[in-house]
Design a protein with these regions (language model features):
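Short beta-strand segments at enzyme active-site cores
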Residues: 38-42, 125
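Short, well-structured N-terminal submotif of metal-dependent ribonuclease cores
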Residues: 1-39, 54-68
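Acidic, PIN/NYN-like endoribonuclease modules and their adjacent C-terminal/linker elements
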Residues: 1, 112-143
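Active-site neighborhoods of divalent-metal-dependent phosphate/nucleic-acid chemistry enzymes
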Residues: 60, 78-122
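Short, conserved active-site loop motifs that form the nucleotide-linked donor/cofactor pocket
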Residues: 35, 79-80, 136
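Alpha-helix capping/helix-boundary segments
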Residues: 8, 43, 87-88, 110-111, ...
Length: 143
């Protein structure tokens, strides 16, 4: 199963992004395919926060547009939501301790822990910060 990071979701949604064509095509490929693909809850939260933020985008996506986009992804038959469960904390704790993770990097550790807990084969991301988590395979689908 492939999970999709925040930046790829943002690129797929924001037509003004230079990476929109590739990002939209890749997410559409997952959404229209039969194979299960994953959306970590933190990535959806971050997506909403980023695309509706007026200091990041001018104009930002309207709330109804961002909510509609999330709804569309969640309505695909092959989408799986990655949420915290009983085994999440031990996994996150190990990642934090082993990688000496603190500060803002904790947000990436949360996503990594969710992916590892749910058996994700690869996280699609354009963010190199995930290399801090060697147990998580990352792929940049834009290159």
């Amino acid at each position: 199963m492939i999970a999709v990071d925040t930046n790829i979701l943002v690129y797929s949604h924001r037509r003004d992004s230079e990476f929109h064509p590739a990002g939209a095509a890749k997410v559409r490929e997952l959404a229209e395919g039969r194979a299960l693909w994953a959306l970590p809850w933190p990535c959806l939260h971050e997506f909403f926060s980023i695309v509706t933020h007026p200091r990041i985008y001018d104009p930002p996506s309207r709330v109804d547009q961002a909510l509609g986009q999330i709804d569309a992804w969640l309505e695909t038959a092959s989408a799986v939501l990655l949420a915290e469960g009983e085994t999440y904390w031990p996994r996150l704790r190990d990642l934090l301790a082993d990688g000496k993770i603190s500060g803002p990097a904790v947000h990436d550790a949360r996503i990594a822990a969710l992916c590892l807990t749910h058996g994700v084969q690869a996280l699609w991301t354009a963010d190199r910060d995930f290399t801090r988590f060697p147990r998580l395979r990352t792929v940049n689908p834009l290159i």
